[in-house]
Amino acid sequence: AEQLKEAGQYFTHNDTGVPILVTRNRANEVKAFINVCRHRGARVVTEPCGKANTLSCPYHGWTYDLNGNLRGMRQPAGFGAVDKNSHGLVELPAFERFGLIWVQPKPGDEKIDIQSWLAPMAEQLTSLNIESHTMFRQWSLNLNMNWHIALEGFLETYHFCSAHKNT
């Protein structure tokens, strides 16, 4: 949640197979959407993060507010009667708890009860005090590898004596 301190801040996430756009609206609520324009399917936001008052598709310029509502179209007369209420961004259930943002990436799924779902971990999540943390750096590695092996290398010290004997 540290990435969305102010209204209009947003970030995109593409690692679930669903292009996700997460933003904070003017009412200080976290909102998540499928990051696809309802006109021709282009990505609405192409940057990994930023801040904007509105979200505009770079392809034909359809514009959405921070709640995902369609607010503007270029040359609207060429479209006839378009019901703007039915052409907003597809919203995804999003929750802000314990300094983290939780998003359900499938729009048709039943909304989970986040309090019940996180209850078994609530004490541990609270103790981490993530709300007070600041992101130092973010980067992505796009490698053809088994992520379990890479992660385990940072979690165990058994390999230190042989792999890092001179460091």
Task: Identify the meaning behind each predicted range.
Residues 1-30, 63-167:
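Rieske [2Fe-2S] iron-sulfur-binding subdomain
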Residues 9-58:
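Glycine-rich active-site/cofactor-binding loop and its immediate structural neighborhood
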